[in-house]
């Protein structure tokens, strides 16, 4: 692990030089008040980032991470509550009457052994919930999110004349297992604390260069449902299949037939994916087993499409079992799910214009929705109009070279994922402060005008 003095040296000798030398990063001779405010907290935000990066913790085990964030927010004057929904953190800063706006960060890291070669790379190893020895890494950039949120929190606390209302900061555990948001809600997140008028969340991406942010009006992330099917047959000798009911063959037929649900039952233009990640059965090549297991991930955006896919999978599984003469119908279990993240279109358009006015023309990029999932959707389902946006963290030159050669930079969840930290933090804090100051004005009714429901669209 690096000492704090060494962390400081890295910031000054490495990150600051990197910020000045990266193509596409402009350093203005004249700084705005917000630029100066961001610069004033940047060294401490970098220290926090490097510390978090070296001390990653797995989902639902973020005890050190949560305590570190809570202590720092408490020092800034926030009213902090810990252990919400497990290791969750809620920090409230009241600044007179006005709207309530929520800003969320995730706390957890991934069971990935870091291979970036960075001087501050994680060397943490631990046991996961199944007892396996695993490396641990912030391979999804949640350390960038936390450090940005802390810097934003500091600027908002030190410049209370620029906004009014209630700022609600959320440190959410277990995003990677899509369980943390729901646990916080069940633990009274919106009953023990003010229910926000607007919710904000940011996620980093190596698909955009530093200095740019991405927005997606409407559906941004997909419904995600995990389905496990146990197919029951009748085992026997592989040389005498006529005495058996082969569950492997039934599973194979299910695997093929379910694809027709997408291609023949879902309207063209409605996104839908059924992927089978595993079929497991048997112990020996000449033994037909008694059963087989299949694992599915099912993705969609629209609620009706989601229900059609899930019902169709169960229908196909039972039909194929009946066709094979199975005496026992398959067991179909949905064991892990989260809904789509929906960005309020009116709010998104408003904040996109606001961000471009501060970050510069061309800095806001409209992105297509993607089929990955995010349990921030649980907050949206509670009736919180939201804006979920992406933060570019890629070296502009490396990204351009990769695109020119038809390659992609190491993405989130890769052991090589390495955001360009200082400019990413700077843009992240600038974007978050800009959004919060824009929304934390007027009355709750005023801020609701920026949402689809109140705009009547």
Regions found by a protein language model. Give the residues of each.
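N-terminal secretory signal peptides that target proteins for export/translocation
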Residues: 1-7
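Bacterial N-terminal signal peptides
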Residues: 11-26
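Signal peptide processing junction and immediate N-terminal pro/mature segment
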Residues: 24-30, 448
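Acidic/His- and Gly-rich active-site-bordering loop/insert found
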Residues: 30-138, 143-151, 155-165
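Divalent metal-coordination and catalytic microenvironments
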Residues: 52, 73, 91, 103, ...
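Histidine/acidic-residue-rich, glycine-tolerant segments that coordinate divalent metal ions
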Residues: 125-137, 143-144, 160-278, 283-289
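Metal-dependent amide/peptide-bond hydrolase catalytic core
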Residues: 249-457
């Amino acid at each position: 692990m690096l000492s704090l003095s060494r962390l400081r040296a890295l910031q000054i000798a490495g990150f600051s030089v990197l910020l000045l030398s990266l193509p596409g990063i402009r350093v203005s001779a004249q700084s705005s008040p917000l630029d100066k405010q961001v610069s004033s907290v940047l060294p401490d935000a970098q220290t926090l980032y490097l510390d978090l990066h070296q001390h990653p913790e797995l989902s639902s085990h973020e005890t050190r991470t949560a305590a570190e964030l809570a202590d720092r927010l408490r020092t800034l004057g926030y009213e902090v509550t810990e252990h919400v929904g497990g290791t969750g953190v809620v920090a409230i800063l009241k600044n007179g009457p006005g709207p309530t706006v929520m800003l969320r960060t995730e706390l957890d890291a991934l069971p990935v052994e870091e291979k970036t070669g960075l001087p501050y790379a994680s060397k943490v190893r631990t046991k996961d919930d199944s007892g396996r020895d695993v490396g641990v890494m912030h391979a999804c950039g949640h350390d960038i999110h936390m450090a940005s949120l802390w810097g934003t929190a500091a600027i908002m606390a030190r410049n209370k004349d620029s906004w009014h209302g209630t700022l609600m900061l959320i440190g959410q555990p277990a995003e990677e297992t899509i369980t943390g948001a729901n646990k916080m809600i069940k633990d009274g997140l919106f009953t023990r604390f003010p229910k926000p008028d607007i919710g904000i969340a940011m996620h980093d991406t190596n698909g955009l260069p530093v200095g740019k942010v991405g927005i997606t009006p409407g559906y941004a992330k997909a419904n995600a449902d995990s389905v496990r099917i146990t197919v029951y047959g009748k085992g026997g000798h592989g040389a005498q299949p006529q005495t058996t009911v082969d569950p492997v063959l039934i599973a194979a037929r299910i695997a093929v037939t379910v694809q027709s649900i997408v291609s023949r039952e879902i309207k063209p233009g409605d996104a839908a994916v059924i992927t089978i990640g595993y079929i497991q059965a048997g112990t020996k090549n000449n033994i037909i087993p008694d059963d087989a297991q299949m694992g599915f991930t099912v993705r969609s955006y629209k609620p009706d499409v989601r229900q059609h896919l899930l019902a169709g999978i169960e229908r196909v599984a039972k039909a194929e079992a009946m066709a094979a003469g199975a005496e026992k119908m398959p067991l179909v279990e949905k064991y892990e799910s989260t809904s789509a993240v929906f960005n309020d279109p009116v709010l998104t358009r408003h904040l996109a214009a606001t961000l471009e006015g501060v970050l510069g023309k061309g800095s806001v990029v409209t992105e297509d929705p993607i089929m990955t999932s995010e349990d921030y959707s649980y907050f949206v389902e509670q009736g919180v109009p939201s804006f979920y946006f992406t933060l570019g963290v890629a070296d502009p030159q490396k990204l351009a070279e990769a695109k020119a050669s038809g390659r992609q930079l190491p993405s989130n969840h890769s052991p090589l994922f390495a955001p360009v930290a200082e400019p990413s933090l700077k843009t992240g804090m600038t974007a978050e402060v800009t959004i919060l100051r824009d929304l934390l004005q007027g009355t709750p009714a005023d801020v609701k005008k920026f949402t689809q429901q109140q705009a009547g669209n």
